C-alpha cells in the first residue's frame, strides 16, 4: 500500500515497502561467512520496478543500529519518513521506496544503539556522489553500451608476462587544464579524446590512474578514498568515466587503477565509526589508526570487511572493464609495527610483527581477481624486502603479478643526482639491482613519489647546465629501458617538466615549444617504439635468460654494457651507457656474434637535442675477443648517452 501526503506530493511513497529485498538466504550466508564478493549488486541503492512502479531499493550494513532511515530531497531530509527494515541478524537494513530514482541525492541516518548517537552517513556502496565538498550519495544506474570487445578478448594476451608494458602514470585533475576557464580540470569525456591521442602518439601500452575513487580532500590525490564503488564526480558522471576507459580500450591501451585498501579517511560522513562502533576499522588504535596519515585502517580479520574490499575490486573489473590494479601502501598492511614505535603495536598470535589478517586478505584478493577476471593484473607498491610478493599464493606468495622496484628508483635517482665526477665512486648503485632483479616480477617506476614534497622534478634533479640536464634525463630513460622489468613514468617527466608536480595546476605543455623539451619527448616516443617492437627488450623482463652483463665493472669510465635477449634467445640487443659528460672514443665491448651491428637508438642524436655524435649508423664486429666473447665492437660513446645496437645481415 502507498500512502502519500497530498500537500507535498512528489510522486514518492511515504511508506517503505519492507517486503522488497535483493537478498536471498544464500546472500546472507555468504555475507556472514566472508565469501560474498558481488555485494555491489545487493547493497547500496538500486533502481528497480515493483508492481509497475519504479523506485529504489536501499541496502546498508549497520549491525549496531537501532534505526536506519534514508533521507534526501525526496523527503525533505526528514529521517522519520523512510525507515529501513533489518534483515534477520545479518546487520543489513533494507527497503524499497517507490518514486525515488536516478540523480536524487541521499544519505543514511543511523541511530546507534550506543550512546544514542545520530549519524548521517554517505552510502558505502554508492555508485555516484555529489561533487565535493558536498557529501551526499547520488542514486545512479550503471548501464553503458561498451564497444571494447576486441580489447577484452585479447587482454590476456596483451598483459601476459612476455608482453611489453610501458605505463604512463596520470593524475586526471592536473594532466591538462583549461587555463582560460578558471584553470578547470578536463572532464572524463575531454580526457577520452586528448589523453588517448597523446598515449597513442607516445607509444605507451597502459595508463595508470592515480585513485579515481571518490575522495573528499582533493589534496590527498585520491589516496584517502571513501567512494570504493564510485569514480569521483569532479570530472563527470559514471558513464563518462566508462567512456574514457572504452575509448582507451578501443585504441589498444590498457587501464590500471590505483586502489587503496590500506586505509581510509576519518571524515564524518564516511565509513569510520559507521554505526556508532568501529565497524570498518579495527577498534584498537594500535591496529586501526595510521599515525602518519591520521586515517583509519581496515579490520582485515572481519568477514564483512573482506566482502567489502574484494567486492570493490571486482566491481571495477566488472562494471568499468579496468584491466588491473596497482595496490597502494602494501607494506603498511603487511607489518603490524609499520611506522610505530615499541609499545605502539600489537604482536600477532605467534609474537611476530606480520599482520596475518592483512596477508590473508591480500592473498584472497589476488586469488579472486585472477579467478573471476583472467588476464587482469595486480601490482604491489611494496617498499620492503617481503619475499614472494609477485609469486602465486599456492607457492606461498602474496599472489600479485608484479611489484614496484622502489629500491631501483631510489638508487638510480641518487646516482643520477651526483656530479659525474663523483659517479665512479657510486657505480654499485647502477649494478646492485641485478643481484635481486629476478626474485620478483618488477616494474621500474619513475613515479609521482619522486617529484613532490620538495624533491624537485626529474629534470631539476639532474646535475650540470641545461644541456647536460637534458642529456642526463635522456640517459636516465635509456638506462631504465635497457634494464629488465616493465616501465612506468609519471606524467610530465617524458618532456622534462621543470616544476615539481602540483595537483591543482596543469603540466606545462608550453615547454614543448622548446627544442630541448621536444627532443626529450621525441626520445621517449622512440624508446617506447623500440621497447614494444623489439622482442629482446620485453619478452624476458622477468627471466635471467633475457639479460647478460657485458661489463658492469667499468667504474673508472662510469660506463655499463649489457645484452638483452628474447624468450628464445634468437634476438639480441646490446645497450651501452656512458654516464660521464666526456665522449669515449675507441671504446671496445664484447659482441656475442660476428655481424654488422646497427645503431638503433642514440640518445645523443641531434633530433633529441644531443650533440650528434655516434657510430655512423652501424659498425662491424671485429674478430677480436673481448669480455669473454669471440668478437667485439669498437664504439664511439657520446657524452651522457645511451646507445642501443642490433645485429643485422645487411648494414644498409
What are these regions (language model features)?
Residues 102-106, 616-652:
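C-terminal beta-strand-rich structural cap/linker in extracellular carbohydrate-active enzymes
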Residues 130, 149-162, 171-354, 619:
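Substrate-binding/active-site clefts of carbohydrate-active enzymes
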Residues 60, 108, 170, 199, ...:
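Conserved, mostly hydrophobic/aromatic
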Residues 61-68, 592-594:
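Short proline/glycine-enriched turn/loop motifs at strand-loop junctions of beta-rich domains
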Residues 1-57, 87-169, 174-183, 190, ...:
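The feature marks proteins involved in alpha-glucan
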Residues 80-88:
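Short, surface-exposed loop motifs enriched in S/T, G, D/E and P with embedded aromatic residues
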Residues 132, 321-323, 338-504, 532-604, ...:
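Conserved alpha/beta catalytic core and glycan-binding cleft of carbohydrate-active enzymes
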Residues 516-537:
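Catalytic cores of secreted or luminal carbohydrate-active enzymes
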Amino acid at each position: 500500500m502507498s500512502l502519500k501526503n497530498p500537500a507535498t506530493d512528489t510522486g514518492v511513497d511515504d511508506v517503505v515497502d519492507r517486503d522488497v529485498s535483493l537478498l536471498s538466504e544464500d546472500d546472507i550466508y555468504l555475507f556472514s561467512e566472508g565469501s560474498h564478493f558481488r555485494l555491489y549488486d545487493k547493497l547500496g541503492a538500486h533502481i528497480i520496478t515493483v508492481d509497475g512502479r519504479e523506485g529504489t531499493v536501499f541496502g546498508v550494513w549497520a549491525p549496531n543500529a537501532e534505526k536506519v532511515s534514508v533521507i534526501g530531497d525526496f523527503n525533505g531530509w526528514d529521517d522519520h519518513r523512510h525507515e529501513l527494515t533489518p534483515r534477520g541478524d545479518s546487520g543489513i537494513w533494507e527497503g524499497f521506496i517507490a518514486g525515488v530514482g536516478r540523480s536524487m541525492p541521499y544519505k543514511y541516518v543511523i541511530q546507534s544503539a550506543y550512546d544514542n548517537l545520530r549519524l548521517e552517513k554517505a552510502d558505502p556502496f554508492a555508485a555516484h556522489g555529489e561533487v565535493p565538498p558536498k557529501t551526499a550519495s547520488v542514486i545512479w544506474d550503471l548501464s553503458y553500451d561498451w564497444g571494447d570487445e576486441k580489447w577484452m578478448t585479447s587482454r590476456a594476451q596483451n598483459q601476459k608476462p612476455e608482453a611489453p608494458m610501458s605505463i604512463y602514470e596520470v593524475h586526471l585533475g592536473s594532466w591538462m587544464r583549461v587555463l582560460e576557464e578558471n584553470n578547470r580540470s578536463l572532464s572524463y569525456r575531454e580526457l577520452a579524446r586528448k589523453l588517448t591521442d597523446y598515449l597513442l602518439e607516445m607509444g605507451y601500452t597502459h595508463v595508470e590512474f592515480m585513485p579515481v575513487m571518490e575522495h573528499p580532500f582533493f589534496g590527498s590525490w585520491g589516496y584517502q578514498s571513501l567512494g570504493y564503488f564510485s569514480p569521483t564526480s569532479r570530472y563527470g558522471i559514471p558513464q563518462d568515466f566508462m567512456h574514457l576507459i572504452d575509448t582507451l580500450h578501443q585504441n589498444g591501451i590498457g587501464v590500471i587503477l590505483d586502489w587503496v585498501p590500506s586505509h581510509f579517511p576519518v571524515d564524518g560522513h564516511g565509513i569510520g565509526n559507521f554505526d556508532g562502533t568501529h565497524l570498518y576499522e579495527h577498534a584498537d588504535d594500535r591496529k586501526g589508526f595510521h599515525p602518519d596519515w591520521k586515517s583509519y585502517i581496515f579490520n582485515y580479520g572481519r568477514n564483512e570487511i573482506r566482502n567489502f574490499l574484494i567486492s570493490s575490486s571486482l566491481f571495477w573489473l566488472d562494471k568499468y572493464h579496468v584491466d588491473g590494479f596497482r595496490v597502494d601502501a602494501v607494506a603498511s598492511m603487511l607489518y603490524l609495527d609499520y611506522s610505530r614505535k615499541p609499545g605502539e603495536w600489537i604482536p600477532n598470535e605467534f609474537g611476530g610483527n606480520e599482520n596475518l589478517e592483512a596477508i590473508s586478505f591480500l592473498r584472497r584478493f589476488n586469488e579472486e581477481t585472477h579467478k573471476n577476471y583472467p588476464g587482469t593484473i595486480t601490482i604491489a607498491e611494496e617498499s620492503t624486502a617481503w619475499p614472494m610478493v609477485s609469486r602465486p599464493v599456492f607457492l606461498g606468495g602474496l599472489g600479485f603479478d608484479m611489484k614496484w622496484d622502489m629500491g631501483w628508483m631510489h638508487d638510480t635517482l641518487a646516482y643520477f643526482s651526483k656530479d659525474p665526477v663523483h659517479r665512479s665512486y657510486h657505480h654499485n648503485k647502477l649494478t646492485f639491482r641485478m643481484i635481486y632483479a629476478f626474485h620478483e616480477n618488477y616494474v621500474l617506476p619513475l613515479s609521482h613519489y619522486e617529484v613532490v614534497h620538495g624533491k624537485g622534478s626529474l629534470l631539476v634533479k639532474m646535475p650540470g647546465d641545461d644541456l647536460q640536464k637534458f642529456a642526463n634525463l635522456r640517459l636516465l630513460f635509456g638506462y631504465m629501458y635497457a634494464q629488465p622489468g616493465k616501465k612506468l613514468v609519471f606524467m610530465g617527466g617524458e618532456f622534462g617538466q621543470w616544476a615539481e608536480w602540483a595537483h591543482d595546476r596543469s603540466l606545462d605543455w608550453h615547454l614543448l615549444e622548446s627544442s630541448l623539451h621536444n627532443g626529450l619527448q621525441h626520445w621517449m616516443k622512440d624508446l617506447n617504439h623500440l621497447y614494444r617492437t623489439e622482442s629482446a627488450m620485453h619478452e624476458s623482463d622477468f627471466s635471467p635468460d633475457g639479460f647478460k652483463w657485458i661489463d658492469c665493472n667499468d667504474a673508472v669510465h662510469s660506463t655499463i654494457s649489457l645484452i638483452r635477449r628474447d624468450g628464445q634467445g634468437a634476438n639480441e640487443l646490446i645497450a651501452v651507457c656512458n654516464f660521464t659528460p666526456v665522449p669515449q672514443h675507441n671504446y671496445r665491448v664484447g659482441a656475442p656474434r660476428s655481424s654488422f651491428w646497427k645503431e638503433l637508438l642514440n640518445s645523443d642524436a641531434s633530433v633529441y637535442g644531443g650533440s650528434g655524435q655516434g657510430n655512423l649508423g652501424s659498425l662491424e664486429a671485429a674478430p677480436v675477443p673481448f669480455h669473454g666473447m669471440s668478437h667485439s665492437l669498437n664504439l664511439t660513446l657520446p657524452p651522457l648517452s645511451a646507445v642501443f645496437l642490433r645485429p643485422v645481415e645487411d648494414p644498409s
